[in-house]
Amino acid sequence: MEVALLSFSSSLSPLCHQRISTLTPKTSNSPNYPRLPVIRSAVSRNKKEETVEAVKSHLENCHLLAAINYKGLTVKQFQDLRRTLPDTTKLIVAKNTLVFKAIEGTKWEALKPCMKGMNAWLFVQTDEIPSAIKPYRSFQKERKLENNDFAGAVFEGKFYAPDNFKVLETMPTRAEVYAKMLGALQSPAINLVTTLQAPAREVIMVLMAYIKKLEDESNA
């Protein structure tokens, strides 16, 4: 935001000079350029609000939100990292307090244990979690950034600590889930019972795939 400073001609009357001096705060360091704390605080507040709204926007189609310890990373390393990530992920740096303000009261609030230290935030906007995480793991290994590990993540409302990341990194792909459950539906009844004990989301996914398969066969 630019602030215009107006100058006045010496031909102004003493009364005008008196009025101007009453409106201009005097400072010992810069008598001609008064400080503008109100404007600065307003700009700072606007930037914070923009950050909170940006986080909320990234969360709209988000499947996983992870915190990465970026302390010690150079600007170039951070830029290189961003270039390695797929289009389905977003990586930003934001203060913990602002991120928490955006996630407070939502399922993402489970990420609260990560609200300390210096974090970059990875928004995964696809349900193919392993393929979204892998680029960072590869970058971390290549650059020997052992200290810049995941601090934690939230997936489907559940918090995953660094020790539990193996679960996220080895999740089956959508195609693998379809193949496994379609095979179970076509197998003896005992396997079907086992299939129906799977999480509801997976059951719905496979049933939809099975219906599509039947439709394709009938249209053939």
Swiss-Prot record:
Fetch the Gene3D superfamilies from UniProt.
3.30.70.1730, 6.10.250.290
Transit peptide, residue positions per record: 1-41
Cite the InterPro entries for this sequence.
Ribosomal_uL10, Ribosomal_uL10-like_sf, Ribosomal_uL10_bac, Ribosomal_uL10_bac_type
Its subcellular locations are: Plastid, Chloroplast
A GO CC term assigned to this protein in UniProt: chloroplast
One Pfam family linked to the record:
Ribosomal_L10
Enumerate the GO terms in the molecular function aspect.
Answer: rRNA binding
**CDD domains for this protein:** Ribosomal_L10
Sorted alphabetically, which keywords does the UniProt record give?
A: Chloroplast, Plastid, Ribonucleoprotein, Ribosomal protein, RNA-binding, rRNA-binding, Transit peptide
Which family is annotated? Belongs to the universal ribosomal protein uL10 family.
Q: Which HAMAP family match?
A: Ribosomal_uL10
**How would you summarize the oligomeric state and partners of this protein?**
Part of the 50S ribosomal subunit.
Question: Which purpose does this protein serve, as stated in its record?
Answer: This protein binds directly to 23S ribosomal RNA.
Q: By what name is this protein known?
A: Large ribosomal subunit protein uL10c
Q: From which source organism is this entry?
A: Arabidopsis thaliana
Q: Which gene codes for it?
A: RPL10
